[in-house]
A protein has these predicted regions:
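Active-site-adjacent segment of FAD-dependent monooxygenases/related oxidoreductases
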Residues: 45, 49-115
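A conserved short coil-to-beta-strand element within the FAD-binding core of flavoproteins
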Residues: 125-139
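C-terminal helical "tail/cap" subdomain of flavin- and related membrane-associated enzymes
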Residues: 309-387
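Core beta-strand elements of the Rossmann-like FAD/NAD(P) dinucleotide-binding domain
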Residues: 6, 144-153
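Beta1/beta-strand and adjacent pyrophosphate-binding region of the FAD-binding site
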Residues: 2-16
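Conserved FAD-binding catalytic core of PHBH/FMO-like flavoproteins
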Residues: 114, 153, 157-265
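Glycine-rich FAD pyrophosphate-binding loop
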Residues: 25-46
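FAD/FMN-dependent oxidoreductases across multiple families
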Residues: 233-298, 315-321
Length: 387
C-alpha cells in the first residue's frame, strides 16, 4: 500500500522514469514509481548516450557516475557496401563529452535505481496501472497490486505502448516505417574492428550498423530488414546475422550472441495537451527510428527538464503554470527536431534502388569532404543544444 498522498507518481521504471523520479525527489517532491515488470532489465537494450544528454546530466552528478560504466566511441565511418564514403570525428564537438558513451541499459537502470532509493523514492514492481482519474487537484491511480495512489501529478514513462497515454485518450500521431529492424549483441573476432568507431554501411540489402560495446570483443549490430522479418526472429541467430552482415560488407567471426531483438519502428508524437496533470515523457511521448540511438537521449532530456519545471508548477498551482507550459513547448520542439533528423537519415540509409543510393552516396561524400559538413553531422549525433 501507498499510505499517503504523493506529489508525483511516475509510471515506468526504465531509465527515463527512474531519472525523472530521482531528480524530482532530489528537488524536494514526494515520488513513487509504479512498474508493471517484476524486475529490472538484464539486457543491454538502449546503449547510446550522446554529448548533449551527458551535459544535461552533469549538474546532478549522473554523467560522472555513468562514465566508468561505458565505452567512448569518438568517430563515425560511413560506407556504401565495401566502399568507404568517409567519416567524421566527434572529438571536435564543443562539449566536455565529445563522444558517444555506450552503456548497457541494465547498468544505467541499476545506477538510477540505486540513486533513486537513496533519494527516498520507492519503486513498486509487478504493479500494472489499470485506471487514472483526474480532477482539478490531482490524479488517482489504480493498479492491480496497490490500493489507490493519490498524486498531484502523474508522469507517464511507460514506453511506446504507453498504458497511461491510452487511458488519457491522447492521440499518438505518425507513421510506421516499412520493414523491420534487428539488434544483436555479438562477441566477434575481427582484428580490423576499431573499438572507438561506429560503422554505418548502406547497400541494396539494407542498412548495417556496427557499434563497439562496453566489453572488448563485443559489438552491437543493427540490421534493417526491408522485408520485415519480425515473426521469424529476423535473420536468426549468430550464423544468420554473420551471413547477413557479410553480405552487406562486414565480415567477422561471430562467436556468441548474448541478446537479439527484432521489431518494427515508428515515427510518432503525442498530441499536445496543456490541461492535463498526466505528463508524457520518453517513448510514451515520442518514438523515432533507431538510427543514431536518439530515443533514449530524447527521453532523458525530457526527464531532466521536467525535474527543473515541475517543482515550481507544484508550488504555484496546476497544469496551466507558465513554466510548465514552456517545458511542454521546449520538449515538443526538441522531439520534432529529433524525429525530423532521424526520419531523414532513415529514408537515406534504407534506399534500395541503385540510382537513389548513388545520389545518396554522392551527397554523403560531399558532406564529409568539408569541415562544415563533418561538424554538422557530428552535431546531429550529439543532439540539440538547450534552448
Amino acid at each position: 500500500m501507498v499510505g499517503d498522498d504523493v506529489d508525483v507518481a511516475v509510471v515506468g521504471a526504465g531509465p527515463v522514469g527512474l531519472s525523472a523520479a530521482l531528480l524530482l525527489a532530489r528537488a524536494g517532491l514526494g515520488v513513487v514509481v509504479l512498474e508493471r515488470r517484476p524486475g529490472p532489465v538484464t539486457e543491454s537494450r538502449a546503449t547510446d548516450l550522446h554529448a548533449r544528454t551527458l551535459e544535461a546530466l552533469t549538474p546532478s552528478g549522473l554523467a560522472e557516475s555513468l562514465l566508468p560504466l561505458g565505452r567512448r566511441v569518438d568517430a563515425v565511418e560511413m560506407w556504401s557496401g565495401r566502399r568507404r564514403l568517409g567519416g567524421f570525428d566527434l572529438a571536435r564537438l564543443r562539449s566536455p563529452y565529445p563522444y558517444i558513451l555506450t552503456v548497457p541499459q541494465c547498468a544505467t537502470e541499476g545506477l538510477l535505481a540505486a540513486e533513486a532509493e537513496r533519494a527516498g523514492v520507492r519503486v513498486h514492481r509487478s504493479t500494472a496501472v489499470r485506471s487514472v482519474d483526474e480532477d482539478a487537484d490531482g490524479v488517482t491511480v489504480r493498479s492491480d497490486a496497490l490500493g489507490p495512489v493519490r498524486a498531484r501529478w502523474v508522469v507517464a514513462a511507460d514506453g511506446a505502448s504507453s498504458t497511461l497515454r491510452a487511458l488519457a485518450g491522447t492521440a499518438f500521431r505518425g507513421r510506421t516505417y516499412a520493414g523491420a529492424w534487428q539488434l544483436a549483441d555479438l562477441r566477434v573476432e575481427d582484428p580490423s574492428l576499431d573499438p572507438a568507431r561506429v560503422h554505418m554501411v548502406g547497400g541494396p540489402r539494407g542498412l548495417l550498423v556496427v557499434l563497439p560495446m562496453h566489453l572488448d570483443g563485443w559489438a552491437r549490430v543493427v540490421l534493417h530488414l526491408p522485408h520485415g522479418q519480425v515473426a521469424g526472429g529476423g535473420v536468426g541467430g549468430p550464423e544468420g546475422i554473420a551471413a547477413e552482415a557479410a553480405a552487406r560488407g562486414w565480415t567477422a567471426a561471430v562467436r556468441e550472441c548474448r541478446w537479439t531483438s527484432t521489431f518494427r519502428t515508428h515515427r510518432r508524437l503525442a498530441a499536445p495537451d496543456g490541461r492535463r496533470r498526466v505528463l508524457l515523457i520518453g517513448d510514451a511521448a515520442h518514438v523515432c527510428s533507431p538510427i543514431g540511438g536518439q530515443g533514449l537521449n530524447l527521453g532523458l532530456r525530457d526527464a531532466v527538464s521536467l525535474a527543473a519545471a515541475l517543482p515550481a508548477a507544484t508550488a504555484r498551482g496546476g497544469p496551466a503554470d507558465a513554466g510548465l507550459a514552456a517545458w511542454r513547448r521546449a520538449r515538443r520542439a526538441d522531439a520534432l527536431g529529433v524525429l525530423a533528423r532521424t526520419d531523414l537519415a532513415t529514408r537515406a540509409w534504407t534506399l534500395r534502388s541503385a540510382p537513389a543510393r548513388a545520389v545518396r552516396d554522392t551527397a554523403v561524400r560531399g558532406a564529409l569532404t568539408t569541415a562544415a559538413g563533418r561538424r554538422l553531422l557530428a552535431e546531429s549525433v550529439a543532439g540539440p543544444r538547450p534552448a
